């Protein structure tokens, strides 16, 4: 384990003028894990130039009453409140929760329209897409997170696809959350709905533990990522690699150099296959706080992207997310 002490004074912010959109973060108030407006604001003020953020659903602040399928509207109301605070101008220039990726049970089929419309209204028209978990594996031990497995093969189910069809009608994208062996399921979905942008989360949902902790892990992952990159309506988020399921062995307090070495091959492979115009960086905070501070994670991303041109960096750190999530 590395015992390197980290503080804001220890970290030299790289390329501090680079304008960034954090394409994926959460806010929540869980037992032992509070990450709300003040905590995020502290991170945003840690040195990097964050122009705006994209809030991605995390089952936060659901309504306690009402129809089950509409309880998710509580999260949209919560996001609207956070964005309203930010828009007051009292807390700095970053537009917090400028875009919202909400949760909806797409297996409702056509009836999901009421949920989608409610999410848009309750979020103050910030809804840009929907995310639902499709994580599943034959080995339950690989699920190191807090959400249970989804139904096996849910992305292929007829009820899910009837609901998914409504996304295009509402001009919404889909954030795909699965493990990397399930990427063929995402490819099938993308081919069936070519007019709906699909954003693969967390460089594909790398599984590097249990039966997947093998020497050919990277090549197996790369093969699937390459297949996904050939589908024009698939995008990919760069980050989300601090989870235990990824299987990295850099200890509990990795240095920037260790993270660049571990994460770099995966992130650069995605960039080289998809192109900067279909890649977008994400902090995945607060889950990825286990790897280090907000300022440190952005330094790591900037080091990984150091050899790309200024225009490519602009796409990776800003404009891909801005265009995809319609941030003005």
Predicted regions located by residue number:
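Catalytic pocket-lining loop regions of alpha/beta-barrel enzymes
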Residues: 150-280, 291, 309
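Mid-to-C-terminal alpha-helical segments outside catalytic/metal-binding sites
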Residues: 1-19, 23, 35-43, 51-52, ...
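Short, well-ordered coil/turn segments that N-cap beta-strands
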Residues: 16-19, 48-52, 92-99, 124-128, ...
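Active-site gating/metal-coordination segments in enzymes
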Residues: 2-5, 67-182, 188-191, 204, ...
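Histidine-centered catalytic micro-motifs
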Residues: 19-30, 200-203
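Conserved, mostly hydrophobic/aromatic
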Residues: 24, 53, 79, 100, ...
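Short, acidic/polar
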Residues: 37-44, 76, 109-119, 220, ...
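Alpha-helical scaffold segments that flank or form the walls of functional sites
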Residues: 30-95
